[in-house]
Amino acid sequence: MPIKPGEEVIFTVPIRKIKKIVPRWKRAPRAVKFVREFVARHAKAQEVIISTKVNEKIWERGIEKPPSRLRVKVKVEEEDRDGKKVRIAYVDLA
């Protein structure tokens, strides 16, 4: 069941899943992409906007050691663009 517009939900993103797949020196950038994909999939959103706080938390310990999991607060809103409804998910630290 998708998140309703205006509703806030807290997700725990399992960043640990990418650690075996991605080389050490690509982990933090790939973790940001993973958070974006995870939220888009679970919130059924076409666009995902990640706050700078989430980005800084991922990069806090450098490029090689992102956190194993991250609790994020997701708020979904709908916009009209050219007559089509677009779901946008805003991601912030929980």
UniProtKB/Swiss-Prot annotation:
GO terms for molecular function: structural constituent of ribosome. Keywords: Ribonucleoprotein, Ribosomal protein. One of its GO terms (cellular component) is cytosolic large ribosomal subunit. The keyword Zinc does not apply. CDD domains: Ribosomal_L31e. GO terms for biological process: cytoplasmic translation. The keyword Ribonucleoprotein applies. InterPro entries: Ribosomal_eL31, Ribosomal_eL31_CS, Ribosomal_eL31_dom_sf. Belongs to the eukaryotic ribosomal protein eL31 family. This is Large ribosomal subunit protein eL31.
